[in-house]
Amino acid sequence: MNHTKSSFIKLALECQVLKFGEFTLKSGRISPYFFNAGLFYHGDSLRKLGQFYAKTLLEQEVSFEHLFGPAYKGIPLATATAVALAELGRDITVTFNRKEVKTHGEGGQLIGSPLTGRTVIIDDVITAGTAFRESQTLIKENGGILRGVIIALDRCERGLTEKSTLSEIREQGIEVYSIINLFDLIEFLKNDNQYEQVQKLESYQERYGA
């Protein structure tokens, strides 16, 4: 496992963003782990999080000049990543949306840069894909070109059908990048001799894996 992935998992554990136990998901499934990027709320952890996203984008050589952060979790992610990219000499622009259209002041649904050019959607995880589809529509309506999606964790899990939402996105010709995926997490736990957790995650993946 490379240093970036292991360092990200350690940060997620330290901030209790990543937890192990029994968690009931919206789908009704009982998951042995849970990931909540909303718990990256300290300035230093947000700074590091932005660096992880930025490094992943650069390592994957993604061709883009614009980040779109879906409300609400995507907003700090886009901001932190844009700052991290600027520190690495890559100046990109940021846009995010409002949940409700504003009818006064500057009005509209979008805040930040005009949503044009080669754009990457940034989020923490993608499950049902609702936020992705809304973002995809906004980008298209405003003249942008969707070049990819980056998330923190790919659960490698199918949805209510045999396919995962990420598989359906990829079938549209849209690349999906992640800082880590479930198999990285399993490898990390094996290296840390946490075999009980490994067994639970492998059983879950065998049952629900995409």
Curated annotation (Swiss-Prot):
* UniProt xrefs under SUPFAM superfamilies: PRTase-like
Write down the top EC class of this protein. transferase
Residues holding 5-phospho-alpha-D-ribose 1-diphosphate: 26, 72-73, 98-99, 102, 104, 123-131
Which PROSITE patterns does UniProt cross-reference here? PUR_PYR_PR_TRANSFER
Its keywords, alphabetically, are: Glycosyltransferase, Magnesium, Pyrimidine biosynthesis, Transferase
Q: Which reaction does it catalyse?
A: orotidine 5'-phosphate + diphosphate = orotate + 5-phospho-alpha-D-ribose 1-diphosphate
GO terms for cellular component: cytoplasm
E.C. no: 2.4.2.10
UniProt: orotate binding residues:
F34, F35, T127, R155
Pathway per its UniProt entry is:
Pyrimidine metabolism; UMP biosynthesis via de novo pathway; UMP from orotate: step 1/2
Subunit annotation: Homodimer.
Entry's family note? Belongs to the purine/pyrimidine phosphoribosyltransferase family. PyrE subfamily.
Name the UniProt record assigns to this protein: Orotate phosphoribosyltransferase
Task: State the organism named in the record.
Answer: Legionella pneumophila subsp. pneumophila (strain Philadelphia 1 / ATCC 33152 / DSM 7513)
